[in-house]
């Protein structure tokens, strides 16, 4: 009995998470942009036949960037709910969240350069 209830709760959590992911994909332009880049790098990974270690690194930074972008979007939604008008403190909160996305994006670019520059140079 207890076990079944735990499973039901986990399934409900998955449904809620799915709703959140659906919202990100359908409504958040920044998330769509990051998702597009992720798909482009997946295609590039197959094209250049990157190694397993390179795949791990690439998938890890893709998950990092998409996750941080999702957190940034949730912070922005919450901030707008709490204070719908312009507010310096809310602006600072949003800036810090966006800065976290920038850090993860820069890290992803560094990893992409490390992975792909040798493959591109081999073509030249």
Predicted segments with their positions:
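Hydrophobic alpha-helical transmembrane segments
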Residues: 1-74, 82, 86, 92-94, ...
């Amino acid at each position: 009995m207890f076990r079944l209830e735990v499973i039901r709760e986990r399934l409900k959590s998955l449904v809620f998470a799915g709703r959140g992911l659906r919202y990100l994909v359908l409504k958040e332009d920044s998330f769509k942009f990051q998702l597009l880049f992720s798909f482009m790098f997946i295609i590039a990974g197959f094209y250049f036949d990157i190694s397993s270690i390179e795949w791990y690194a690439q998938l890890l930074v893709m998950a990092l960037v998409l996750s941080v972008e999702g957190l940034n979007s949730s912070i922005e939604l919450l901030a707008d709910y709490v204070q719908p008008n312009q507010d310096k403190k809310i602006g600072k909160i949003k800036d810090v969240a966006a800065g976290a996305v920038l850090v993860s994006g820069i890290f992803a670019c560094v990893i992409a350069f490390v992975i792909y520059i040798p493959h591109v140079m081999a073509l030249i």
